[in-house]
Amino acid sequence: MNIEKFTTKFQEALSERQSLAIGKDNQFIEPVHLLTALLNQQGGSIAPILTASGVNVALLRNELKTELNKLPQVIGNGGDVQLSRQLINLLNLCDKFAQQNQDKFISSELFLFAALEERGTISDILKKCGAKKEQISQAIQHIRGGQNVNDQNAEESRQALEKYTIDLTARAESGKLDPVIGRDEEIRRAIQVLQRRTKNNPVLIGEPGVGKTAIVEGLAQRIVNGEVPEGLKNKRVLSLDMGALIAGAKYRGEFEERLKAVLNELSKEEGRVILFIDEIHTMVGAGKTDGAMDAGNLLKPSLARGELHCVGATTLDEYRQYIEKDAALERRFQKVFVDEPSVEDTIAILRGLKERYEIHHHVDITDPAIVAAATLSHRYISDRQLPDKAIDLIDEAASSIRMEIDSKPEPLDRLERRIIQLKLEQQALQKEEDEASRKRLEMLEKELAEKEREYAELEEVWKSEKATLSGSQHIKQELDTAKTELEQARRAGDLAKMSELQYGRIPDLEKQLEQAETSEGKEMTLLRYRVTDEEIAEVLSKATGIPVSKMMEGEKEKLLRMEDELHKRVIGQEEAVDAVANAIRRSRAGLSDPNRPIGSFLFLGPTGVGKTELCKTLAKFLFDSEDAMVRIDMSEFMEKHSVSRLVGAPPGYVGYEEGGYLTEAVRRRPYSVILLDEVEKAHADVFNILLQVLDDGRLTDGQGRTVDFRNTVVIMTSNLGSDLIQGNKDESYSEMKALVMSVVSQHFRPEFINRIDETVVFHPLGKENIRAIASIQLERLAKRMETRGYELVFTDALLDFIGEVGYDPIYGARPLKRAIQQEIENSLAQQILSGALLPGKVVTIDYANAEVQARQ
């Protein structure tokens, strides 16, 4: 018999039955080998046909296995196997049936016909498992769809819809889809387009995360509930699985063949199916090779004729990039824009989804948590869309509470560690025989017994609290299942089941849930099971670094004493410290304008008076790290073209993909201190970029993304007017500021100066300030030496001397560092290296007899 006359699937089964016979040491390949291979074949026709015709497939597998084990085994035949006479007869019978059906190729389902026709073991097994010729014939006709087998790959293109699509209406019927709240206008618009005679294909366009896929799920739910116009009733919504369609298409034309099979099956459905293609831009160019058609071109004829009801979904950027380029494809779709929902709509959506998340995480989600998720995500997460970002916050906060419930509470964990520690100590003391050890052992055993009793009591409380929680969650799950069953009964018109559920089971479960929640309401000592607005704020703070959680008493105290903290490192400069501290306090108290940066300052003053030091101190105060400061030296932006380095190169230029120096830093750390050092040295065009940062707290980078500056403190430093500050240091602060501002207004444009919150003029440092700074600098030196094992002590005489030597009214505090290096550090280094100073002893550094002396 010519093997080429069989379909590809049948050929695969024939080769599989041979290896099955060899593996079992059978001399002949029997029909039982072939039926086993066909039944186990992935993507084959036999298993679906048998299931559809009411055959017990599990029993059939067992019977075939038993029959295989009965076959005689021949050891040492060198792997030589032959077809049995019975199998040859069955294959010839398959050929005969193929000719009767006018098939060009022999398909695998004909083997079932042949097996039932011919008397023998295989026929008996099939009949025993419930196979009837008429039912199998009907199942074969249904799976063939009235078509002949004219192609060797005919079997692979069958049941294409089952293989390559997901039935959303079936999922909606079984209650597996999340409820869709709101979005009535968009769903109505999509239905309106679907009702058209031709080009009845809406494409949902919107930003990622606004709920495009949810609209199609909402449509599927409405179809299931019968809440659609007559033209859409009883239709199915199928989602095309592009991954399954492309996966495994090895040969040229295989992908097109699969897609064509899907389209053919859809045309047979005669408009009873709505095909949903998520990420529809992937169709453009999918399967495209040299000379081959892509998926988009295969879809065009069906879309234009109205044979294919298709709903697409894609983002604005991808629609522009892929679909708008192909005008012929674009004209076949009707655009439906999906906007981001408002905060109020998002709250309604979250309230609808709340129950699903409560059941999944086994926690309670409070209403303040829902409101906080919508409002806080809208304000602080600017690069993503509602409701997606709000749902993420709820999901993660619920997950963190669930993790706490599942893990051992902290008091229990602490006690357990203490008990282990005491037991180890007990083991060690039991070996000792002196009186002191025995007394210690007695005390220890007493403490151990007390701790173990305490642990047992706490563990009991923990277990009972966990049991209470799991009880209410179990009732919630049962209630959810009952509600789904009620919907299914309503659709099926089963009035008896509806009344049983609606007036019996559901009220009973609701009563049980109320009782369980009442017992939960009693204060729990160990477990937190409620997601509140505080948990939402915590999750947001971890994700963005922005402190939005309620302030602890410690933090309130810290903010009230902020000036004292800043003055520990910044000496003098009362006005500057007050201005910065007030801006931070306004922000944390929630009083600052939400659409502008926390604060924007221009620090003016001579060199070395503490302008940059104040920024570092502020970063350390806010973030416990000086690295949280984004420092940009504006002297690097003296040329006009260097402006692009701040926001990123425009398209077509080198470095376009890298992003901007300023914008990327703020995108990664939205809550930071931005220091623009020596701002007057930058090109005038740089200030045009800063205008929108200072006014609206936003900046668009080279790639068109909007970067949020609303949670940053923008500080610019400048030396403008420093000569006036030096010359008029004895005048009042307001007079000196007026003089300096006249110079500043000549250099900067009025619109730039007008947008700055506060311009702060720094005073020149006096001798007493320099002495205080010397004390701070020497303290840092002492800390550095401490790591090497040396303890440094400085005398007042030394401080006076360093303050005198390091004082320079023109250069501020910077000469002080040089004075410390030359007068102290150089001689210290020599003495340490020579061995004159040894670690572990106090080193006193003094100024006497006109020289600095270090002694131990």
Curated annotation (Swiss-Prot):
Please verify whether the record's keywords include Metal-binding: no
Q: What are the boundaries of the region Linker?
A: 341-545
Q: Which stretches does the entry tag as region NBD1?
A: 159-340
Instruction: Name the cystine pairs.
Output: none
Regions crossing the membrane: none
Gene Ontology molecular function terms on file: ATP binding; ATP hydrolysis activity
Q: Where is this region: NBD2?
A: 555-764
Keyword terms of this UniProt record: ATP-binding, Chaperone, Coiled coil, Cytoplasm, Nucleotide-binding, Repeat, Stress response
List the residue ranges of the region (Repeat 2).
83-146
Residues holding ATP 2: 605-612
- Give compartment(s): Cytoplasm
Q: How does it assemble?
A: Homohexamer. The oligomerization is ATP-dependent.
What the protein does comes down to: Part of a stress-induced multi-chaperone system, it is involved in the recovery of the cell from heat-induced damage, in cooperation with DnaK, DnaJ and GrpE. Acts before DnaK, in the processing of protein aggregates. Protein binding stimulates the ATPase activity; ATP hydrolysis unfolds the denatured protein aggregates, which probably helps expose new hydrophobic binding sites on the surface of ClpB-bound aggregates, contributing to the solubilization and refolding of denatured protein aggregates by DnaK.
The family assignment reads:
Belongs to the ClpA/ClpB family.
Q: Which protein is depicted?
A: Chaperone protein ClpB
Q: Which organism is it from?
A: Haemophilus influenzae (strain ATCC 51907 / DSM 11121 / KW20 / Rd)
**What is the phylogenetic placement of the source species in the record?**
Bacteria, Pseudomonadati, Pseudomonadota, Gammaproteobacteria, Pasteurellales
